[in-house]
A protein has these predicted regions:
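N-terminal helix-rich module
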Residues: 1, 9-39, 43, 47, ...
């Protein structure tokens, strides 16, 4: 009877902690995958001296979806004619399927296509050509410990450099054009 009591207490404490750990790992994995693809896209653009595009492609369907969600998958490809669409003469560099779990994304631009020029900069015609991506799950901006938010905010400067923001107060701040999770 005592053993059952100890097991029940251990499960009561351990199960929620395990669920939080699993959710944190899913968020970290998804964020790392997306940032790796952004780095690969910029690197390929610089290396090949041509436009490289990262666009939403649901489950690796092979075609960019205007207004699509990066949460459903994305493709990085050498965009020889810089039209944001995968053509026969374009080279696919990377494909990623849908994000695991109930992760969703938010972006500051439509269409969601991110085009890196031969100089590695973003091909956005705007006074301040920054791009922002936010990854969220059902926990929103909840503090997961040490003031780290459950969600993530990726800032991409006009120069094509990425910065990952994890601090809860920064994600919820006025600096975040997506307004937090």
């Amino acid at each position: 009877m005592v053993v059952l009591g100890v097991v029940a207490i251990a499960l009561g404490i351990g199960a929620p902690l395990f669920a939080t750990l699993a959710a944190n790992n899913r968020m970290s994995s998804a964020t790392n995958d997306l940032v790796s693809s952004l780095i690969a896209a910029r690197s390929e653009a610089l290396k090949r001296q041509v436009t490289v595009t990262l666009c939403p492609t649901p489950d690796g369907a092979g075609a960019c979806v205007a207004g699509g969600s990066l949460g459903s998958g994305w493709t990085v490809f050498v965009d020889r004619n810089a039209d944001g669409a995968i053509s026969a003469d374009d080279v696919v560099v990377q494909q990623h399927g849908a994000l695991e779990g109930d992760l969703r994304d938010g972006v500051t631009a439509t269409p969601v296509d991110l085009m890196f020029t031969a100089a590695g900069t973003l091909a956005i015609d705007a006074p301040r050509p920054d791009f922002h991506i936010q990854l969220c799950d059902q926990r929103g901006d909840a503090d997961t410990g040490a003031d780290i938010a459950a969600g993530r905010w990726i800032q991409i400067s006009g120069l094509g450099r990425q910065q990952l923001v994890r601090a809860r107060l920064d994600i919820q701040s006025d600096r975040n054009p997506l307004g937090g999770c």
